[in-house]
Amino acid sequence: MNYKLFSPYTIKDVTLKNRIVMSPMCMYSSENEDGQVTNFHLVHYGTRAAGQVGLVMIEATAVLPGGRISNKDLGIWDDSLIEGLHKTTTFIHDNGAKAAIQLAHAGRKAELETDALAPSAVPFNETMKTPVEMSKHQIKDTVLAFQQAAIRSKQAGFDVIEIHGAHGYLINEFLSPLSNKRTDEYGGSPENRYRFLREIIDSINEVWNGPLFVRISANDYHPDGLTVQDYVQYTKWMKEQGVDLIDCSSGAVVPARIDVYPGYQVQYAKHIKEHANIATGAVGLITTGAQAEQILTNNEADLIFIGRELLRNPYFPRIAANELGFELEEPYQYERAPGKISTNK
């Protein structure tokens, strides 16, 4: 029997062998605090590729040193960082998966000794420091940093770029009226709050012609914040700019209580897919093959982003295949393992 979860998916000239994506998750493991890839990253991402994930997405990678969440985040702000990232993509490709990178700036959530930058001088909560409102010059420099990061991503061998526009980091801070109190052309109306992201997408499109994703937080979980309907308009603009897929997460732009349950964010992927007519990825407490397959067969999303479940078990695709009774291709080195479900050599 054929399963959609294990069917190929093509975006532009990149074909994923299945619909399983390793969701980007910060590992805080650049031990020398220089943004460099370490041996841990090679093993961490290479193992998920060997486990038959279709697309392995590298964690949020800072486009500027001051855009890191912590000093131990990965970086892509300098050419010296390309070599380590290229080793990582080579590991991933050698094990049969495609490689993606999430480009990010932490904004007011940067927990560094230096000043945190944000659209407005509004702290995330009472315990975090008040950020510095970005000048227009700093905005332009950050847009350029995303463009240069895209160039380096191409040089490092990535197949897909994702822009991190979610979870209360810098781009999300510009999009939400809860964190953006500006009165210039970057604040106020939805069009103005979108301007920063628009400029980033345009700048990346000048140097990158591969698949482009954007991760969003489709619900601020606040009465004065954004809802998924607001993001329908944002994602329509993204589609007009050539974005290929929306990775639909939620929350974290302000402190909020969120009731989580299995697949609690799938509704956002479905809503954006239906109302913005753009491909989406579903993420959030998706833990079984049957659950993932149902999301795809119900046409609620196009890709399945798996996070913590892949931390618990890097061979989740094999477990999902066994659960569904599907014969998944496996590395020939593992064929002697008990419970193998393929005889490919």
UniProtKB/Swiss-Prot annotation:
Sites where the protein binds substrate: 28, 164-167
InterPro entries tied to this protein: Aldolase_TIM, NADPH_DH_bac, OxRdtase_FMN_N, YqjM-like
GO terms assigned for molecular function: FMN binding; NADP binding; NADPH dehydrogenase activity
GO biological process: response to toxic substance
Keywords, alphabetical: Detoxification, Flavoprotein, FMN, NADP, Oxidoreductase
Top EC class of this enzyme: oxidoreductase
Pfam families membership: Oxidored_FMN
Positions of FMN binding: 23-26, 60, 102, 215, 307-308
EC number: 1.6.99.1
Listed PANTHER family: NADPH DEHYDROGENASE C23G7.10C-RELATED
Similarity comment: Belongs to the NADH:flavin oxidoreductase/NADH oxidase family. NamA subfamily.
Job description of the protein: Catalyzes the reduction of the double bond of an array of alpha,beta-unsaturated aldehydes and ketones. It also reduces the nitro group of nitroester and nitroaromatic compounds. It could have a role in detoxification processes.
Name of the protein this chain belongs to: NADPH dehydrogenase
Species assigned in the record: Bacillus cereus (strain AH820)
Gene name of the record: namA
